[in-house]
């Protein structure tokens, strides 16, 4: 008899989300709390829960809120106008008007005063007094002009360091007149468009036409990514889009897929399989070698271009249409990551994060960090200022003891690589679309899984894994013929907590069945994942 599998799918009640750290001191406290939480969770029964579906917003126009519809329409109007008028990529340069005119504006009141003094000397005493009165009235105007201009200078100094502020304030009085003239010139700058940046009306981004009047349904999908990245602020989303287009042109991103970077970085990140919602999965393996590459200014640019290439390859796997899969799932394995004490590494990491965040908006459905060391919580505090709140809301963290369980919430076993506790192997010739079944074993009890072998000549192949093993496991072939001997395929073995999946096979010479026995000797319920295939002479 084949074991019936009855699995209750539970919705995840909560997930560990990286929240922004306000001050470094809180990091340690939060880390301890997280650690305690993990230990408490490990005392609960083990099981594979499907992820609480990360509800990505709909890209269908009808599903948007009224304010979102308006924002999308406004952005499309701005984009249409910019493309048609050929102003989308034009850079506005500032040019100052002649300084002479500005100087005249500042000194004009004094010239008038001198002129009136000369006229007053030739007039009567009574008229001279009146002229002096006029001078008294006119003179303050120069002070007024200076006061207004000086006030314009102050906000520009807020971005300087404390030392620079002190130095500038010391010299301010000595160069007051010069500052006034300079500031007046700046205030009257004019904007001139750079005519070199022309835009074709057939301009595309990730293969999607950007001109709204073309009517491509994918255009809304792309524009909504920029709007969501900027909280539906139209002007900010428009500027972000323009900067992305300029960045891609300057860095020749559209031709990056044809570049060769060698095999050195091949294991640092790679695409493999899909998650439960069909998002392509990208695995990022953090290691000492990778950190050295990022930390070296010489190698950093090569790494960045290689990483952009990988992102472009991932986007090619997406369906950028309303209702399609439009984002990737990112897995970050920190198992062999070194500590974080070198400044140059953080400069590199910051550069990677900022560039990807600024130029690939909303292309990541979730970031899952696995094999997280204790220092990760300090790293979170350092990186937090460079991440948007929306990005941080997609973070999930798993300590080493919870890696397999966490990943299986989001990725099915047949799509999860074997090194992470799944059944997926490179160039697997044994399995293709076979269903992965589940069965729960209660504490102190046993369950058997039966794989039928109806023909006398055939081969049976199976994969099996138990979350957090700590069970006794054995495999037997039981013939159908009465009185025939049972064949021990795998004698009883005590499986450790960190054992990986098992694949085995048996070639039978008579009809019967394979019986897999899981004896749960622990105090927690265990979930068993398995799949099998029967190869007969006719099928092979």
Swiss-Prot record:
Gene Ontology biological-process entries: cell division; cellular response to auxin stimulus; protein localization involved in auxin polar transport
Give the bilayer topology.
Peripheral membrane protein
Q: What is this protein called?
A: Patellin-4
Keyword Ubl conjugation in record: yes
| Species lineage | Eukaryota, Viridiplantae, Streptophyta, Embryophyta, Tracheophyta
Q: Where is the GOLD domain?
A: 433-534
Offer a single GO CC term for the protein. Answer: nucleus
GO MF terms here are:
lipid binding
Which species does this protein come from? Arabidopsis thaliana (Mouse-ear cress)
Remarks, miscellaneous = 'Patella' means 'small plate' in Latin.
Domain of life, per the record?
Answer: Eukaryota
Subcellular location(s) per record: Membrane; Cytoplasm
* Signal peptide location: none
Q: List, for all copies, the residue spans of the domain called CRAL-TRIO.
A: 258-428
Q: Composition bias, kind Basic and acidic residues: at what positions? A: 94-140
Supply the CDD domains for this chain: SEC14
Function description: Carrier protein that may be involved in membrane-trafficking events associated with cell plate formation during cytokinesis. Binds to some hydrophobic molecules such as phosphoinositides and promotes their transfer between the different cellular sites.
Question: Chief localization class?
Answer: membrane
Which residues does the record list as Phosphoserine (modified residue)? Answer: 53
Coiled-coil regions listed in the entry: 61-183
Record family assignment:
Belongs to the patellin family.
Q: Which Pfam families match?
A: CRAL_TRIO, CRAL_TRIO_N, GOLD_PATL1_C
Family annotation (InterPro entries):
CRAL-TRIO_dom, CRAL-TRIO_dom_sf, CRAL/TRIO_N_dom, CRAL/TRIO_N_dom_sf, GOLD_dom, PATL, PATL1-6_C_GOLD
- Cross-referenced PROSITE patterns, in alphabetical order? CRAL_TRIO, GOLD
Entry keywords, A to Z: Cell cycle, Cell division, Coiled coil, Cytoplasm, Isopeptide bond, Lipid-binding, Membrane, Phosphoprotein, Transport, Ubl conjugation
Task: Indicate whether Metal-binding appears among the record's keywords.
Answer: no
Record region (Disordered)? 89-140
């Amino acid at each position: 008899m084949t074991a019936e599998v009855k699995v209750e799918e539970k919705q995840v009640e909560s997930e560990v989300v990286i929240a922004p750290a306000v001050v470094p001191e809180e990091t340690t406290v939060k880390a301890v709390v997280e650690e305690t939480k993990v230990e408490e969770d490990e005392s609960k029964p083990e099981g594979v829960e499907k992820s609480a579906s990360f509800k990505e917003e709909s890209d269908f126009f009808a599903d948007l809120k009224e304010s979102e519809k308006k924002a999308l329409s406004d952005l499309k109007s701005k984009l249409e106008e910019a493309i048609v008028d050929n102003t989308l990529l034009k850079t506005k340069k500032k040019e100052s008007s002649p300084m002479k005119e500005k100087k005249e504006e500042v000194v004009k009141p004094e010239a008038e005063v001198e002129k009136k003094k000369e006229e007053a000397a030739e007039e009567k005493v009574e008229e001279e007094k009146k002229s002096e009165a006029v001078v008294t009235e006119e003179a303050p105007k120069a002070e007024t002009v200076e006061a207004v201009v000086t006030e314009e200078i102050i906000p520009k100094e807020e971005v300087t360091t404390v030392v620079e502020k002190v130095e500038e304030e010391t010299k301010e009085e000595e160069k007051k007149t010069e500052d006034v003239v300079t500031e007046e010139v700046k205030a009257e700058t004019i904007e001139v468009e750079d005519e070199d940046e022309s835009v074709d009306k057939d301009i595309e981004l990730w293969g999607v036409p950007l001109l709204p009047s073309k009517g491509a349904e994918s255009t809304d999908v792309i524009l909504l990514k920029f709007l969501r990245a900027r909280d539906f602020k139209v002007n900010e989303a428009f500027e972000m889009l323009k900067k992305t287009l300029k960045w891609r042109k300057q860095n020749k991103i559209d031709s990056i897929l044809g570049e060769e970077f060698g095999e050195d970085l091949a294991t640092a990140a790679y695409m493999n399989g899909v998650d439960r919602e069909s998002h392509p999965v990208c695995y990022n393996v953090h290691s000492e070698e990778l950190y050295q590459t990022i930390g070296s200014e010489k190698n950093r640019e090569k790494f960045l271009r290689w990483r952009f290439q990988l992102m472009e390859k991932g986007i090619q796997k997406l369906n950028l249409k309303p209702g399609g899969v439009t984002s990737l799932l990112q897995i970050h394995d920190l198992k062999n990551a070194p500590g974080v004490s070198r400044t140059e590494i953080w400069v590199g990491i910051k550069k990677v994060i900022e560039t990807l965040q600024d130029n690939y908006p909303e292309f990541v459905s979730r970031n899952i960090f696995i094999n997280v060391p204790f220092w990760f919580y300090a790293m979170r505090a350092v990186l937090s200022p460079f991440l948007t709140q929306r990005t941080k809301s997609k973070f999930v963290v798993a300590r080493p003891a919870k890696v397999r369980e966490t990943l299986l919430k989001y990725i099915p076993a047949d799509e999860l690589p074997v090194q992470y506790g799944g059944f997926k192997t490179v160039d697997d010739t044994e399995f293709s679309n076979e269903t992965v079944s589940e069965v729960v074993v209660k504490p102190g009890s046993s369950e058997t899984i039966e794989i039928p072998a109806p023909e006398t000549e055939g081969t049976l192949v199976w994969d099996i894994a138990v979350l957090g093993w700590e069970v006794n496991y054995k495999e037997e072939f039981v013939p159908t013929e009465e009185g025939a001997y049972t064949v021990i395929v795998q004698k009883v073995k005590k499986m450790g907590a960190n054992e990986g999946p098992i694949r085995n096979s048996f070639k039978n010479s008579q009809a019967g069945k394979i019986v897999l026995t899981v004896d749960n000797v622990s105090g927690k319920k265990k979930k068993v994942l398995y799949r099998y295939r029967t190869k007969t002479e006719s099928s092979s």
